[in-house]
Amino acid sequence: MALIDSNDFFRPGWWIRSAHLQTVWGRATRPRRLVAYRREVWETPDGDDLVLDWLDSAPGTPIVIALHGLEGSSYSVYIQGLLALTARRGWRGVAINFRSCARDPRRLGQILWNRRPRLYHSGDTADLDFVVRTLAAREPVTPLFAFGASLGGNVLAKWLGENPGQRAVAAAAVVSAPFDLSASARHMEKGLGRFYTESFLGTLRPKALEAAHRFPEAAAKIDLRRTREAKTFWEFDDAANAPLHGFAGADDYYARASSLPFLTAITTPTLCLSATDDPFLPPTCLERARVAASSAIEFVTTARGGHIGFVGGAAPWRVRYWAEERALAYFDLHAPAK
């Protein structure tokens, strides 16, 4: 495993050294529409809709597959920022919207519901696998790269470990991933983590309740009272997310969905970027992931950067997003020579 002291690479802006400012800055200040997508809706093997948002370029150019975080979408600013950089390289980009996360492009606050009685979860790699295999079959000589942030990073890392012999994805980048879901969930019950937790639960609770309203099969699995009253990730996952997706409970879900046990099996060149001040992760989570990482993983930790932050630049009006730039630079290293 290549371990880099990434302080050689990343310096937060002098004006934004706080982990919490790093975490919220992009969402608070970047435009909600950075790119203009072309939308495709694919039918999944289980008979559902999978919404993919594309940035096009010339046929045959490399494709970057992007996976968003918890309660995000293709319109999450870090996904749009990454794909904007992809387009500047003359490459193509495609953002996968996890089930129940796709947005109406005309009204970004409006969720587009799926047909199946389910939502999404941190260990669900089936849709990523479907997209990779479909693209590889359609364009067998086109280089594919994959980027995942937060929950999407956990999904990507788990998929890479589940498929150690895969050759379709040439390289991957994982940013701010909660490799140990149990440790992350417990960490978010403390201090300011409770603020972030309530922010997420503010959309997760009604989404689960709406799924129960729409689908009798979902209502039969979800504990509606406990879902309404959930104040922590563990309580929500145990009442709704885990049983809805076939897990015995939150602990079973965390154990089976965490990417940590899969890191040792990864053979694809993979860049893992994390900050030790990430308010979503305890430091022990990153240390355990670093120890477990295979030799194919370049594990980069920074002292600062928050959660999917890594905001630099000389001033607030001259901002640079280091993780997005670093991920694309890593893909450049593994792209075929022109």
Model region roles, listed by residue range:
Residues L55-Q110:
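Short, surface-exposed "cap/lid" segments of acyl-processing enzymes
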Residues R99-F145, R318:
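Catalytic nucleophile-loop/oxyanion-hole region of alpha/beta-hydrolase
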Residues A137-L244:
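Alpha/beta-hydrolase-fold enzymes
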Residues A239-F262:
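Active-site nucleophile elbow and catalytic-triad environment of alpha/beta-hydrolase enzymes
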Residues I266, C272-S274:
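Short beta-strand/loop motif that positions the catalytic acidic residue
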Residues A292-G309:
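Catalytic histidine neighborhood in serine/cysteine hydrolases
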Residues G305, A314-K338:
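Catalytic active-site module of serine/aspartate enzymes centered on a nucleophile-bearing elbow/loop
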